[in-house]
A protein has these predicted regions:
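Catalytic cores of alpha/beta
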Residues: 77-85, 120-126, 164-177
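N-terminal/domain-start segments enriched in small and hydrophobic, helix-friendly residues
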Residues: 27, 35-39, 118-131
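Generic structural signal for hydrophobic
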Residues: 30-34, 58, 83, 104, ...
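Conserved N-terminal beta1-alpha1 strand-loop-helix module at the mouth
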Residues: 1-77, 82-86
Length: 194
């Protein structure tokens, strides 16, 4: 799928479910349930054991393009390449990495790095990030979107961390292109169950 088509589908959806799970089977069930509930954007994190194989299985299962499947918690270009080869449509990371940006640009795959300051947002945009992930969003609240869009009206942003059903409308009103929402189990719940 073309990079432009992926970005359009993600922004049309407006919501991306962040899937963390204890195992591959659980991750697939959560992803299927999100899609069945109408959420076509899925970010499968590389904290899931065998995440590359889960991405490959979901990419094959939904090869019709019904699911916009991304890889999350991508910390380096090696992991990004693994995810892209497995079938990920986009790459999300908790922080900006210049080499990951280069790799994603080479393959024309959208890269959405986590940024917490306007300097980080500018650096990511200059490196070709199409959408910047505001993370951790709960430290700032929706007001940060207005603050960043003041000097950077062209910035395309999506928040994660602290975005939930009670405040997602506030983020959308603030001008984000999409929101990332965590599915269950939370990272804390996952640690407890081990």
């Amino acid at each position: 799928m073309l990079k432009e088509d992926v970005l359009k589908k993600l922004t049309d959806c407006g919501l991306v479910a962040v899937v963390r799970a204890n195992n591959a089977e659980e991750a697939i069930k959560i992803s299927d349930a999100c899609l069945a509930g109408g959420c076509t954007g899925i970010e499968l994190t590389f904290t899931v054991p065998g995440a590359d194989k889960v991405i490959a299985a979901l990419a094959e299962k939904y090869s019709n393009g019904e699911m916009m499947l991304g890889a999350g918690t991508v910390l380096d270009p090696e992991t990004a390449r693994m995810a892209i080869l497995a079938g990920a449509n986009f790459i999300v990371s908790p922080a900006f990495n210049a080499e990951t940006a280069k790799l994603c640009n080479r393959y024309r795959v959208p890269y959405m790095p986590g940024c917490a300051t306007i300097t980080e947002v500018i650096t990511a945009m200059e490196a070709g990030a199409d959408i910047v992930k505001i993370f951790p969003a709960d430290l700032y609240g929706p007001k940060i979107i207005k603050d960043i869009k003041g000097p950077l009206p062209q910035a395309q942003m999506m928040p994660t961390g602290g975005v939930d059903k009670d405040n997602v409308a506030d983020w959308i009103k603030a001008g984000v292109v999409a929101c990332l929402l965590y599915t269950s189990p939370s990272p804390r719940d996952m640690r407890r169950s081990r």
